[in-house]
């Protein structure tokens, strides 16, 4: 059948398999152009491929990659056969479509090979047209975009202009309420500054401007609750009458009352006026301005805080007023007068404390010498007063101090270079500390100033500060220390405010122990709750304000403390040597902070501000915290100490925590009351000579930030500052926690010097009260506050630092070494506190060496300050560790009080002799 096939006939030989392409070539019709050959090497195939793809898709109605690739492959040959391509494509495309396709493709290839670029001229023309069209379209789009952009710009400009108008209308309002209030007040305040002190008016103005809302609210809470919402300075001031004094009277009062202080302090003030006024004015102006702009938000925050807290503050003022009323009219009047006079006096006394530190110190020391007894009133009322009526406190300060302040200022004015510096440092540290920790400082100031005993403490502080200074540059140091203290006093004075308040209030608390404890617990919870806001606000605004006020030169001390201050705080801890005296004093006020659980808040705020400012200041709160920023910046402090965060948390969240820590603090305050029993003796001792130390001891935590920042008081102050740093952390959670570490510090400091012993003992009384507080409320206080301060606070190292600073020989190294050892030694100190009470000085020496090694790594400068403070506090340290055990504390309280009083009298006499001589 197919024999031929099997016979070997090939398909080529078989006709049946003849080349069909020949037939197809004969049969198919081809376009004429296909006759021409194309050299694909001259053709840019990549340009033609898109056209082929498009064309095949049109013919087939769908995109067939196989056909397209088949065509591409055929064209890749150098000389493709156009007819064969058409025959091959006929199967895919119809014969007709294939013919049309090849008829269109080949001319493109021919034109492409003729073109230099290998691109068909048609494509070039198309491209040109496309380009033209694109250009036209682009131009249209560009014109449209321009129009849209113009419209957008116009809209934006309109919006911006409207916003600017709104902002201007708002900012003037804000600035009117905030910066204008400082400016408005600053005009009289500037006059008053010129009169009383370049600083105090502006501190007032700043406190008024930064704290116009907070202060007004503080005033309102300070005044009656009704005036709290009123926010009207006149109403609130009228209600407080010290607020009224605040604007007109505080300055006039300080002017007449502080004239002698001002005369002496005016010399310094004029020095400071030249420098501080330029600073306080330039800084206060720039800061007032910057505060009005930059702090308008913080002020808003303060306002909102003061508003949001004003309820709390209102309750706390109510509570505080009731405690004040409970405490007696002393509390009631001292709070308004003291607090308000303090806010002015603080402001002024920050200025006047720095400027007329002697007047403020005399008033504070006068307030102090009585405060041993009045401290009850002033301690709780002043604290309350401080918080409630910062401005009220100043009038009283001025009223009380005015008579005593004038003589002591003179006494202190002769030492004014040193004592004025110290008084300014201590007073400034107290009042600035108060300003920074308004509540604490207000109380401290109130206590110092509200109780006329303050003069003795002041002399003691002067003697101690002078002893600490040892004749450090009196005028130069006073100016430098004023400057530094303006910065550091915001920290240290808040601490000193706390410690003085704590010291005065410790005696006050010891006197007011039960009633005051309840009241202070009540108030301190409200303080912890409402004052925590207030502290925030007052610390934020007060710190910012009072720090701002006080630091009007360092106006932003609040800010500085908060944002810029964080480094300054550490700087203040370690670098500012002059500040330490303030910090010593500042520590004394912080004890008030400690003694009052709210003051601990203040302390915690001031410690927060201080140690956190030290740490916080690194963070800048922003505006914080001192403390919206101040609360957040305090978180730095708090952040630095994890317990300080607790305090800070205690501040806003822990108003409950604070109330619990405050309760703990109150139980510490109970312990601190026991210790206030001891602390009263301490505060009596320290109130006189150790009162600065007490301020250290109470304030060690607050002071830890402050003192650690200043090396001069560094030993006494730095140890307590470092204590404050660690204690201030612990103070934040619980001041007494810090005290527990502080006893260690105190023991270490015990050997260095009587003053350091005093301050160490004051620190110990601080730490002692914290420890009993930690021991009595140990579960809440010591674990949370002492342990978390010491353990949680790696920043708490300052507490150990405070301990470490005690080694006066190498305060920085020892304090630094001790800083590391302090945490460990906090625990050890807690264990050894009883032994330490008896073996204080020996153990303190050993612990100093150990803590010095540990603290050496921490902060040499802060440690130096802590060592100075510890060395000074150590004499008191022995009594204070006893106080630390509260059971022993109560027994030892009488002995300690006598001992402290004797020491205070000695230091007072020394201070009087050295200032006068």
Swiss-Prot record:
Location of the region described as Necessary for DNA and RNA-binding in the Swiss-Prot/TrEMBL record: 1-151
Comp. bias regions, Basic residues = 171-207, 276-329, 336-351, 557-574, 581-606, 635-650, 663-677, 822-847
Sites where N-acetylmethionine occurs are at: 1
Q: Which domain of life, per UniProt?
A: Eukaryota
- Residues with PTM Phosphotyrosine: 610
GO molecular function annotation:
DNA binding; RNA binding
Q: Where is the composition biased (Low complexity)?
A: 352-368, 478-501, 607-619, 714-732, 749-772, 782-799, 850-879
Name the residue ranges with Basic and acidic residues bias.
Answer: 139-170, 214-234, 246-275, 503-518, 895-905
Q: What do we know about how this protein assembles, alone or with others? A: Identified in the spliceosome C complex. Found in a pre-mRNA splicing complex with SFRS4, SFRS5, SNRP70, SNRPA1, SRRM1 and SRRM2. Component of the minor spliceosome, which splices U12-type introns. Found in a pre-mRNA exonic splicing enhancer (ESE) complex with SNRP70, SNRPA1, SRRM1 and TRA2B/SFRS10. Found in a mRNA splicing-dependent exon junction complex (EJC) with DEK, PRPF8, NCBP1, RBM8A, RNPS1, SRRM1 and ALYREF/THOC4. Interacts with DDX39B, CPSF1, RBM8A, RNPS1, and ALYREF/THOC4. Seems to be a compound of RNA export complexes that are released from speckles in a ATP-dependent manner.
Stated name of the protein: Serine/arginine repetitive matrix protein 1
Q: Organism source for this protein?
A: Pongo abelii (Sumatran orangutan)
Gene from which this protein is expressed: SRRM1
């Amino acid at each position: 059948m197919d024999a031929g096939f099997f016979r070997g006939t090939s398909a080529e030989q078989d006709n049946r398999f003849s080349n069909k392409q020949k037939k197809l070539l004969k049969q198919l019709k081809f376009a004429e152009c296909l006759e021409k050959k194309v050299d694909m090497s001259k053709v840019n195939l990549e340009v033609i491929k898109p056209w082929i793809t498009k064309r095949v898709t049109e013919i087939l109605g769908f995109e067939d990659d196989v056909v397209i690739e088949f065509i591409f492959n055929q064209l890749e040959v150098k000389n493709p056969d156009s007819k064969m391509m058409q025959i091959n494509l006929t199967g895919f495309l119809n014969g007709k479509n294939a013919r049309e396709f090849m008829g269109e493709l080949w001319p493109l290839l021919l034109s492409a090979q003729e073109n230099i670029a290998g691109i068909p001229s048609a494509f070039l023309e198309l491209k040109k047209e496309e380009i033209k069209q694109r250009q036209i379209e682009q131009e249209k789009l560009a014109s449209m975009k321009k129009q849209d952009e113009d419209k957008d710009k116009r809209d934006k400009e309109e919006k911006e202009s409207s916003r600017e108008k709104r902002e201007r209308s708002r900012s003037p309002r804000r600035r009117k309420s905030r910066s204008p209030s400082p400016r408005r007040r600053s005009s009289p305040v500037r006059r008053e500054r010129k009169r009383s002190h370049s600083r105090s008016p502006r501190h007032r103005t700043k406190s008024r401007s930064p704290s116009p809302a907070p202060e007004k609210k503080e005033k309102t809470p300070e005044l009656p609750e009704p005036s709290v919402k009123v926010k009207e300075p006149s109403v609130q001031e009228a209600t407080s009458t010290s607020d009224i004094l605040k604007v007109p009277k505080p300055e006039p009062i300080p002017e007449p009352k502080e004239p002698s202080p001002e005369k002496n302090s005016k010399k310094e003030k004029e020095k400071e006026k030249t420098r501080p006024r330029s600073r306080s004015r330039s800084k206060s102006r720039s800061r007032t301005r910057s505060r009005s702009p930059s702090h308008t938000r913080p002020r808003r925050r303060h306002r909102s805080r003061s508003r949001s807290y004003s309820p709390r503050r209102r309750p706390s003022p109510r509570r505080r007023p009731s405690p004040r009323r409970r405490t007696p009219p002393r509390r009631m009047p001292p709070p308004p007068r003291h607090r308000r006079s303090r806010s002015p006096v603080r402001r002024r006394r920050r200025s006047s404390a720095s400027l007329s530190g002697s007047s403020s110190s005399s008033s504070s020391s006068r307030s102090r010498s009585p405060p041993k007894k009045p401290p009850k009133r002033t301690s709780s009322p002043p604290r309350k007063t401080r918080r409630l009526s910062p401005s009220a406190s100043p009038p009283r300060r001025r009223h009380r101090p005015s008579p005593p302040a004038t003589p002591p200022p003179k006494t202190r004015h002769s030492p004014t270079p040193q004592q004025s510096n110290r008084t300014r440092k201590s007073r400034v540290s107290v009042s600035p500390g108060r300003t920074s920790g308004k509540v604490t400082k207000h109380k401290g100031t109130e206590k110092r100033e509200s109780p006329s005993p303050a003069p003795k403490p002041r002399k003691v502080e002067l003697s101690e500060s002078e002893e600490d200074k040892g004749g450090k540059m009196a005028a130069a140091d006073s100016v430098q220390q004023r400057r530094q203290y303006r910065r550091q006093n915001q920290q240290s004075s808040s601490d000193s405010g706390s410690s003085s308040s704590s010291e005065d209030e410790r005696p006050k608390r010891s006197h007011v122990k039960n009633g005051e404890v309840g009241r202070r617990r009540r108030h301190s919870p409200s303080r912890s709750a409402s004052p925590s806001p207030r502290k925030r606000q007052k610390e934020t605004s007060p710190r910012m304000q009072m720090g701002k006020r006080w630091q009007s030169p360092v106006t932003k001390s609040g800010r500085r403390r908060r944002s810029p201050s964080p480094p300054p705080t550490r700087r203040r801890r370690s670098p500012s040597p002059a500040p330490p005296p303030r910090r010593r004093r500042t520590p004394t006020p912080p004890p008030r902070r400690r003694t009052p659980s709210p003051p601990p808040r203040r302390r915690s705020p001031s410690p927060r501000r201080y140690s956190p400012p030290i740490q916080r200041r690194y963070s800048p709160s922003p505006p914080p915290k001192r403390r919206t920023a101040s609360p957040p910046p305090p978180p730095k402090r708090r952040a630095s100490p994890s317990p300080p965060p607790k305090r800070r948390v205690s501040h806003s969240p822990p108003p409950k925590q604070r109330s619990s820590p405050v309760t703990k603090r109150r139980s510490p305050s109970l312990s601190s009351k026991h210790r206030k029993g001891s602390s009263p003796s301490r505060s009596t001792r320290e109130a006189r000579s150790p009162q600065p130390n007490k301020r250290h001891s109470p304030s060690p935590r607050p002071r830890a930030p402050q003192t650690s920042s200043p090396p001069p008081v560094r030993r006494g102050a730095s140890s307590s500052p470092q204590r404050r740093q660690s204690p201030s952390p612990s103070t934040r959670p619980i001041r007494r926690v810090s005290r527990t570490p502080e006893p260690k510090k105190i023991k270490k400091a015990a050997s260095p010097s009587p003053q350091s012993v005093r301050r160490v003992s004051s620190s110990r009384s601080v730490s002692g009260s914290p420890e009993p507080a930690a021991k009595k409320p140990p579960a809440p206080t010591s674990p949370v506050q002492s342990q978390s301060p010491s353990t949680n606070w790696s920043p708490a190292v300052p507490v150990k630092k405070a301990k470490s600073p005690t080694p006066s020989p190498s305060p920085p190294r020892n304090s630094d070494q001790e800083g590391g050892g302090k945490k460990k030694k906090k625990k050890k100190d807690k264990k050894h506190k009883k032994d330490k009470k008896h073996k204080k000085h020996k153990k303190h020496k050993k612990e100093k060496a150990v803590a010095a090694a540990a603290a050496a790594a921490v902060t040499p400068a802060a440690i130096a300050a802590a060592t100075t403070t510890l060395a000074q506090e150590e004499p008191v340290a022995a009594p204070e560790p006893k106080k630390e055990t509260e059971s022993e504390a109560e027994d030892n309280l009488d002995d300690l009080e006598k001992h402290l009083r004797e020491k205070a009298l000695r230091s007072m006499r020394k201070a009087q002799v050295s200032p006068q001589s």
